């Protein structure tokens, strides 16, 4: 028996619109089953997509996509959208090398109206499209679909503020599941999920107390009264929820509709048809459940936000085998260092912009809850907030991904560096990140950090050096950033101490002849592998700023040529810093600069991506040998 007779008919939204509305609930079930199977094979974002199935079907059923524009915020919930827009048979390639991207991507499909990956951009982008359509005299509709987690970011409110004052036809769908990746924080989620009216609860309690004894004596009366009580509570909650939400968004100039059940697809279709006919800014408040339809994800949406594979819901836990201990990830090394340091220093505080699990802060929050601050998806605020803490003598550590640190660049300069405030940035996911692709790659931090005055920039080559540099930069009386990659370390033993190294000094990892490899961070390991074959010297620079000028000059004068290696953009990166030192000292030597060229990277297996970029050990060897051969031929 065909498990998906309706879904098999759909290769585009045009096919979807041929279905009767009464068939849509069945289609939703088939689509959810397909998601379970496809994500179970490929991994990827999971719980968010399960929660957006009915909403996605309804949007494509009502709106004339791709003529009408759907802009998905972040893109975590875009898999059903991809399935319904002609990519169903490619879902087995999701996030794989050469396959479908894990986020909407304009070059992948005409249905992907705007490329995303970071949060809170959808309203601004959809507003721009609506404004353009008005200028062009088009009657197309633009829709922004944004989660309540993304609504905690200032950019979303900037767009709401602007949209409410513009005469454009825009729909904002607020997908309210009370989650971002972790549970939401801040006043806005509490506002959206406000409790029932207190007076109603008080009244119900009084009635129960005064009538309970009587009702107990009447058969079935107490059960009936409990049902009435539950219904009154539910109505009170919905009324209060709607009243408060309406007040907020209508004050922004939007006409508010909701909240509505985001899993009742037939009702969603009716509501969206009505909204599509309206003029001006509209906001639809939809209530969904993250992980809907898969009990494990419903019960633990944080764990199942993104998965590598899926266990069977009924599968028994298998006894663990005696396996060798896995190498720790850099994130784990940071998390342990942070807890160790906090236990010894009561001034240490940790800040994260809604990335508790990803940044390794779960244990810290449990052990030091008063010194843990999750500020929501608000990177700009996170940095300035850290500056305020530093002004009062605290020792802030901002745990943040490299790609998200980009969103707070002005705050880095204006609020931290210009005031020389001692804030430590633990910059995770530096370099290639793999399946999440270019929107999440950390390829620019060395370039944009090293030009900031007062900033110390460090790049460890292994997990023990990561701990050393974290301890060193924490004790520096200046702003500092330690950038480290995603994934496991090299397997070296990690100290439990708080040893430090001299700021701005590198070390020689291997002595060789003629060719000197000046390597930074994750590129030290491939440099060592290639140096063994070429008998080259390898310097682990440790710091990009201040850079070890003395070591660079010594290597340049004692070797015939230099190769710089970094997992960062070549423009403005660490290799450029080496060239600046050579120019400053009047040294003219052949230099091969190896980094990420001026290109947008792909997604998939990090090893394949590094090979494509010429930064795997094998690729570095090929490039260096070719460079040496060309130089020999030229001479």
From Swiss-Prot:
Say yes or no: keyword Cytoplasm present. no
**Source taxon at top rank:** Bacteria
**Subunit composition and interactions:** Homodimer.
Task: Say which family it is in.
Answer: Belongs to the transketolase family. DXPS subfamily.
What reaction gets catalysed by this protein?
A: D-glyceraldehyde 3-phosphate + pyruvate + H(+) = 1-deoxy-D-xylulose 5-phosphate + CO2
Instruction: Give the pathway listed in the UniProt entry for this protein.
Output: Metabolic intermediate biosynthesis; 1-deoxy-D-xylulose 5-phosphate biosynthesis; 1-deoxy-D-xylulose 5-phosphate from D-glyceraldehyde 3-phosphate and pyruvate: step 1/1
Instruction: Please give a single GO biological process term from the UniProt record.
Output: thiamine biosynthetic process
Name this protein carries in UniProt: 1-deoxy-D-xylulose-5-phosphate synthase
Q: Which NCBIfam families match?
A: dxs, PRK05444.2-2
Q: Which organism is it from?
A: Neisseria meningitidis serogroup C (strain 053442)
List the gene name. dxs
HAMAP family with a match to the protein in the record: DXP_synth
The top of its lineage is: Bacteria, Pseudomonadati, Pseudomonadota, Betaproteobacteria, Neisseriales
Free-text function comment from the UniProt entry: Catalyzes the acyloin condensation reaction between C atoms 2 and 3 of pyruvate and glyceraldehyde 3-phosphate to yield 1-deoxy-D-xylulose-5-phosphate (DXP).
Q: Which cofactor does it need?
A: Mg(2+); thiamine diphosphate
Q: What is its EC number?
A: 2.2.1.7
Which EC class does it fall in? transferase
What the record notes about the co-factor is: Binds 1 Mg(2+) ion per subunit.
For the ligand (Mg(2+)), the binding residues are 148, 177
Q: Which UniProt keywords apply?
A: Isoprene biosynthesis, Magnesium, Metal-binding, Thiamine biosynthesis, Thiamine pyrophosphate, Transferase
Claim: DNA repair is one of the keywords in the record:
no
Record: residues binding thiamine diphosphate: 76, 117-119, 149-150, 177, 294, 379
Q: Which residues form the signal peptide?
A: none
Among the GO molecular function terms of this UniProt record, one is: 1-deoxy-D-xylulose-5-phosphate synthase activity
InterPro entries from the xrefs?
Answer: Dxylulose-5-P_synthase, THDP-binding, Transketo_C/PFOR_II, Transketolase-like_Pyr-bd, Transketolase_BS, Transketolase_C, Transketolase_CS
Any GO CC annotation of this UniProt entry: cytosol
């Amino acid at each position: 028996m065909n498990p998906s007779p309706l879904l098999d008919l759909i290769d585009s939204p045009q096919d979807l619109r041929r279905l009767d509305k009464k068939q849509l609930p069945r289609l939703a079930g088939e689509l959810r089953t397909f998601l379970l199977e496809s994500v179970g094979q490929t991994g990827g974002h999971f719980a968010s997509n399960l929660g957006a199935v009915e909403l996605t079907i309804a949007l494509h059923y009502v709106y004339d996509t791709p003529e009408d524009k759907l802009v998905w915020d972040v893109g975590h919930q875009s898999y059903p959208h991809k399935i319904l827009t002609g990519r169903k048979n490619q879902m087995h390639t999701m996030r794989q090398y050469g396959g479908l991207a894990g986020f909407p991507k304009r070059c992948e499909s005409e249905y992907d109206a705007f490329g995303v990956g970071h949060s809170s951009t959808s309203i601004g982008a959809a507003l721009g499209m609506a404004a353009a359509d008005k200028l062009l005299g088009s009657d197309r509709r633009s829709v922004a679909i944004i989660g309540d987690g993304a609504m905690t970011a200032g950019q979303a409110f900037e767009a709401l503020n602007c949209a409410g004052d513009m005469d454009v036809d825009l729909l904002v769908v607020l997908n309210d599941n009370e989650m971002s990746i972790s549970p939401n924080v801040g006043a806005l989620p509490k506002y959206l999920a406000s409790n029932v009216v207190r007076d109603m609860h008080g009244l119900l309690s009084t009635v129960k107390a005064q009538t309970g004894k009587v009702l107990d004596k009447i058969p079935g009366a107490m059960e009936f009264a409990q049902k009435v009580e539950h219904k009154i509570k539910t109505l009170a909650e919905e009324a209060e929820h709607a009243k408060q939400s309406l007040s907020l968004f209508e004050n922004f100039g939007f006409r508010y509709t909701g909240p509505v059940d985001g899993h009742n697809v037939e009702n969603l279709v009716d509501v969206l048809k009505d909204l599509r006919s309206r003029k001006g800014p509209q906001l639809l408040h939809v209530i969904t459940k993250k992980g809907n339809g898969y009990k494990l994800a419903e019960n633990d949406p944080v764990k199942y936000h993104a998965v590598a594979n899926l266990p069977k819901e009924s599968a028994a836990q298998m006894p663990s085998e005696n396996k060798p201990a896995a190498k720790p990830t850099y994130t784990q090394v940071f998390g342990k260092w942070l807890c160790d340091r906090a236990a010894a220093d009561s001034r240490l505080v940790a800040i994260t912009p809604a990335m508790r699990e990803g940044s390794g802060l779960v244990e810290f929050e449990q052990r030091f809850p008063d010194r843990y601050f999750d500020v929501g998806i608000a990177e700009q605020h996170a940095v300035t907030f850290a500056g305020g803490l530093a002004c009062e003598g605290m020792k802030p550590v901002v745990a943040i991904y490299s790609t998200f640190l980009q969103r707070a660049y002005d705050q880095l300069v204006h609020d931290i560096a210009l005031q020389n405030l001692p804030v430590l940035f633990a910059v995770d996911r530096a370099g290639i990140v793999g399946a999440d692709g270019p929107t999440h790659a950390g390829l620019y931090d060395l370039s944009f950090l090293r030009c900031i005055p007062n900033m110390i920039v460090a790049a460890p080559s292994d997990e023990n050096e990561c701990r050393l540099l974290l301890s060193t930069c924490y004790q520096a009386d200046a702003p500092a950033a330690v950038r480290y990659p995603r994934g496991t370390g090299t397997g070296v033993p990690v100290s439990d101490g708080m040893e430090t190294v001299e700021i701005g000094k590198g070390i020689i990892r291997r002595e060789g002849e003629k060719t000197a490899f000046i390597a930074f961070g994750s590129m030290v390991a491939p440099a060592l592998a290639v140096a063994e074959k070429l008998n080259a010297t390898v310097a682990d620079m440790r710091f990009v700023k201040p850079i070890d000028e003395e070591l660079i000059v010594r290597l340049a004068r004692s070797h015939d040529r230099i190769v710089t290696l970094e997992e960062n953009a070549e423009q403005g990166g660490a290799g450029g810093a080496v060239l600046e030192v050579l120019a400053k000292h009047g040294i003219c030597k052949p230099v091969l600069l190896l980094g990420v060229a001026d290109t947008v990277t792909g997604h998939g297996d990090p090893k394949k991506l590094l090979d494509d970029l010429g930064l795997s050990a094998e690729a570095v060897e090929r490039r260096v040998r070719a460079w040496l051969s060309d130089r020999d031929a030229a001479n």
